[in-house]
Amino acid sequence: MSYYFNYIGKKLKPRKSVTFSTETKVYEYPREPELTAQEKQKLLEEEEESDFSGFFVIDLTDSDNEIKEEEESEEEEKEISHGAKSTIKSILTNYRNKHGRNRNPRSRSIFKNAQRGYRRREITKIAKEEARVYWEGSDLLDSPDSELPTLPRFDFTPSEMESKRTGFGFTFDEHEEALHGILPGGCTGNTETVDQGLSKQ
């Protein structure tokens, strides 16, 4: 780059130093010389011979021009609104095609990074919505008759944990009951019902 600027600097001529004074000077442009009568006559004859007189006649009573202008402005607004709806991908592809990969090697990386960012933002948006639905239960809250499911408890006391243990060395907590649904003896977490169901078998 330094070579480039040095090369241009040699071609550019240095500016002359200008001294400013407090005196105000009025610069008058040279006026055109006044035409003689013969020259004026020649100009008038030339204007009459030429087809174009230098003036346009516009009929102000006709309102078709105004209607056409309004229609054109509406079409332009439609085009603008349609262009605003175009996705970031199409905007970036247009940018890439306009500037070209060979001319600007960074354009490809700009396109890819922006596309990555767009995908990431879309994924996070979907994930946030899913999390909101899970924790707030927006779908269930919309219908008033539906019953909200009880979330599993994880704050069990040691005595409760012992009561949930069976003789086989594994635990049925409320979450597993909700998932599996049917256990032998219609288990509700009590060891007695589990033992009864197993003894029947």
Swiss-Prot record:
**Bias category Basic residues: which stretches?**
96-106
Extent of Polar residues compositional bias: 189-201
Compositional bias of kind Acidic residues: 64-78
Domain of life, per lineage = Viruses
According to the record, the residues making up region (Disordered) are 64-114, 182-201
Protein name (record) = Uncharacterized protein ORF29
Look up and give the organism this protein is from.
Ostreid herpesvirus 1 (isolate France) (OsHV-1)
